[in-house]
Amino acid sequence: MMLNSDTMELDLPPTHSETESGFSDCGGGPGPDGAGSGDPGVVQVRSSELGESGRKDLQHLSREERRRRRRATAKYRTAHATRERIRVEAFNLAFAELRKLLPTLPPDKKLSKIEILRLAICYISYLNHVLDV
């Protein structure tokens, strides 16, 4: 089967950056004139919040540049750091739980993450061998 990129459509949910503008706390939905834009790449801002030059600058920015500016805010960086910290803590907790299940001498020996994974592979292989015999 041949795939043609012209006819292939992907049914993917929109990403966070495509569904929310950097100004989502400015009132959401419709723009200042009461009509929402159908283009997800257009950022809508109240005219009272930006000066004339600010509005012109924002309109001419590409979607990528608006995304970069939004990610540069302290609020975004703090939220991202919090999410990353939670992810790393969950990751480390999973390694600690796996480590408790591995028989080693001495039992309290500190192992790196790669050592934990390699020992887990060996131990699972050993248990499979024991079951096969």
From Swiss-Prot:
Residues 52-65 have a biased composition (Basic and acidic residues). PROSITE patterns: BHLH. Residues 75-127 form the bHLH domain. It is found in: Nucleus. PANTHER family: HELIX-LOOP-HELIX PROTEIN 1 (PTHR13864:SF20), T-CELL ACUTE LYMPHOCYTIC LEUKEMIA/STEM CELL LEUKEMIA-RELATED (PTHR13864). This is Helix-loop-helix protein 1. InterPro entries: bHLH_dom, HLH_DNA-bd_sf, TAL-like. It comes from Mus musculus (Mouse). One of its GO terms (molecular function) is RNA polymerase II transcription regulatory region sequence-specific DNA binding. CDD domains: bHLH_TS_HEN1. One of its GO terms (cellular component) is nucleus. Keywords: Developmental protein, Differentiation, DNA-binding, Nucleus, Transcription, Transcription regulation. It comes from the Eukaryota. Efficient DNA binding requires dimerization with another bHLH protein. SMART domains: HLH. Residues 66-78 have a biased composition (Basic residues). Residues 25-39 have a biased composition (Gly residues). May serve as DNA-binding protein and may be involved in the control of cell-type determination, possibly within the developing nervous system. Pfam families: HLH. GO terms for biological process: cell differentiation. Residues 1-78 are annotated as: Disordered.
